[in-house]
Amino acid sequence: RRLSFTESYQDLADVEIVFECVTEKLAVKYEVYHQIEANCPHLKAIASTTSAISPADLAKGVATREKVMVAHPYNPPHIVPCVELVKNDFTDPEALEAVSALLEHCGREVCWMNKPAPGFIANRLQHALYREAVYMVEQGICGPEDIDKCIRSSWGPRYTSIGLFDHFDYAGLDLISSIETYLYPDLCNDTAVQPFIQERLDRGDLGYKTGVGVYDWRQRDMDDFR
């Protein structure tokens, strides 16, 4: 049996690596860490799956800060193999290697960060794209439907096979540089939530969970979408 369930920390006495997946509140995480430290004498690493909290802040709540790191999976984790591995300033390299080896054994694709940054790797890239997409809609350049269609039918499929820097080298850095020189001045550099999103937040239109967001989800087949 691959999974077993318990409500007692005492049942974790033989555990060496813990993945923490509790709510994104430091006080709650700290209490879990204290219980783990008290009940896991063979502990090698605590890996938080947080999508937002810095490993430095996580480490403040434990006695064994050298064992703490972030191992952030990407949704949906049963389909998408990426796990971002982020250390704090005191994380033991052996702890990182132990977690990385376990993740790779489970078929995960481990992406290492040399130092923490808000949003880690994937969300920083993704939200830069979100910002530009919203800007294009606000400027009347195109609608949400055509942006989504373009992504699904252009570089979305391409980047399942190659990475950004693979593409840079394939296209040629001289060509990439010429495009950037022409394009960068025209890109969005907003540093706050854009009106297109804020107006929907103010109306309570949050997306699928409320039935309406950018799109009207009330008449869509959600089982098919999922």
How would you name each of these model-derived features?
Residues 127, 137-139:
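AAA+ ATPase "lid" subdomain C-terminal helix
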Residues 1-46, 53-54:
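Rossmann-like NAD(P)-binding element
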Residues 108, 139, 144-226:
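NAD(P)-dependent Rossmann-like dehydrogenase/reductase catalytic/cofactor-binding core
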Residues 81-82, 129-133, 178-183:
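A general alpha-helix detector
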